[in-house]
Amino acid sequence: MFEVVIGLEVHTQLNTKTKIFCSCATSFGEAPNTNVCPTCLALPGALPVLNEEAVKKAIAFGKAVNATINKKSVFNRKNYFYPDLPKAYQISQFDIPIVEKGELFINVKGENKRIGITRAHLEEDAGKNIHENNFSKVDLNRAGTPLLEIVSEPELRSSDEAVAYLKKLHSIIRFLDISDANMQEGSFRCDANVSIRPKGDTKLYTRVEIKNLNSFRFIQKAIEYEVKRQSEAWEDGTYEQEVVQETRLFDTTNLVTRSMRGKEEAAEYRYFPDPDLLPVLLKDEFLDIKIPELPDEKKARFIDELGIKESDAEVLISSLEMSRFFESLISQNLNPKLCVNWLNTELMGLLKGELTIENSPVDAQKLGILIKRIEDGTISAKAAKDVLAFVFENTSVEIDEAIEKLGLKQVSDDSAIEAVIEQILNANADKVAEYKSGKEKLFGFFVGQTMKEGKGAFNPAKVNEILKTKLG
């Protein structure tokens, strides 16, 4: 039996307005090679100037994971040649990163586990190679975009743990609002270092790096395939030939990893301090940066202060947008548990395909009005589902307008309900007698008959109240 050893390197693009060493915009989707200048094109004489906001965002992350923030950190040149790297070196951090020795906690199958974070350092992103037919093109818009590279300790022992770690990290980054962490656009990318060893062995064997994984599903599949490949090679006696230190890519069509190139050692990058950038010396006020409420803290508050079930609280903190939507709901002085039900179950049940809570046709204000109409007895909970479905499809229609159009306004007028109840009790005198002689289950019969006569428009609470009075 083998033990799996996984360490993850996550590159997240920081959401600064400009690049890390120049004033070019970082906006995504612009025409190729338009967000560039002499600095990010590496023209002679152009010098880098560090973006202060990128430093602040790195510090915020460090505080969120209980890390050490180094008051002095150094930028280095990482030397390698690739078409999308104009300078033929990347400005990164090596021996003195801005953040080190952090931690986060994951829960897998009901068990909590601490995962160490070795370091988080600032660096610049490369450009992008685009391969079309017989040509390769280079777009340098992305070159110089600020990255925070977050390196975990090799303490993850399964693909499930790796995905749990990444989801937790992704959530923290989003709640800090230091990156949009959009995996499809490449602003949250993961490299996985995977190796195996016999159970009980403490030696670290040959690790394989799987590059640029950009979905949780593919990360899980890539790790599972690589573990299977290495395990089979060990059992077949071909481990030393088949498993070499290399970089592999994940084939998302066939769900296999394929060799890309040999993996370089740090010495091959010839790191040395960048002579164009002074060491970063942090003043004390930089270390006092306030960070927002994090997912675990928010979850605890929802449970302790609002009385929400843990499983519901997990859904509410599953994304920054979800928690913001919920907090916008309860800010309207609504019952928190009612809000949870209508958000987690009813609205989320309608969001399919490209629709998410972020672009939901029904916003928090509109859903809040619907919940208010349930609370004040204007409509029943059952009718409210029809109203929600209607405004979901007809986005220009307001809640009160939809209630009128659908004819779902609840009747709470005592005299109208009383008249129908009198009629039902008179028509069922024998059942009234049975009820009064102890057959209390008949109460439901009277309620059902009343609601039927009222075509579902009667306020159920009022019906119950009046029936109890009439039946004694």
Swiss-Prot record:
Keywords: ATP-binding, Ligase, Nucleotide-binding, Protein biosynthesis
EC number from the UniProt entry: 6.3.5.-
Domain of life, source organism: Bacteria
Catalytic activity field: L-glutamyl-tRNA(Gln) + L-glutamine + ATP + H2O = L-glutaminyl-tRNA(Gln) + L-glutamate + ADP + phosphate + H(+); L-aspartyl-tRNA(Asn) + L-glutamine + ATP + H2O = L-asparaginyl-tRNA(Asn) + L-glutamate + ADP + phosphate + 2 H(+)
GO biological process per UniProt: glutaminyl-tRNAGln biosynthesis via transamidation; translation
SMART domains listed in its UniProt record: GatB_Yqey (SM00845)
InterPro entries attached to this UniProt entry: Asn/Gln-tRNA_amidoTrfase_suB/E, Asn/Gln-tRNA_Trfase_suB/E_cat, Asn/Gln_amidotransferase, Asn/Gln_tRNA_amidoTrase-B-like, GatB, GatB_C_1, GatB_Yqey_C_2, Gln-tRNA_amidoTrfase_suB_CS
A family per Pfam: GatB_N
One GO molecular-function entry: glutaminyl-tRNA synthase (glutamine-hydrolyzing) activity
Stored PROSITE patterns: GATB
Top enzyme category: ligase
Oligomer and partners: Heterotrimer of A, B and C subunits.
Family named by the database record: Belongs to the GatB/GatE family. GatB subfamily.
Protein role: Allows the formation of correctly charged Asn-tRNA(Asn) or Gln-tRNA(Gln) through the transamidation of misacylated Asp-tRNA(Asn) or Glu-tRNA(Gln) in organisms which lack either or both of asparaginyl-tRNA or glutaminyl-tRNA synthetases. The reaction takes place in the presence of glutamine and ATP through an activated phospho-Asp-tRNA(Asn) or phospho-Glu-tRNA(Gln).
Record-given protein name: Aspartyl/glutamyl-tRNA(Asn/Gln) amidotransferase subunit B
Taxonomy of the source species: Bacteria, Pseudomonadati, Campylobacterota, Epsilonproteobacteria, Campylobacterales
Name of the gene encoding the protein in the UniProt record: gatB
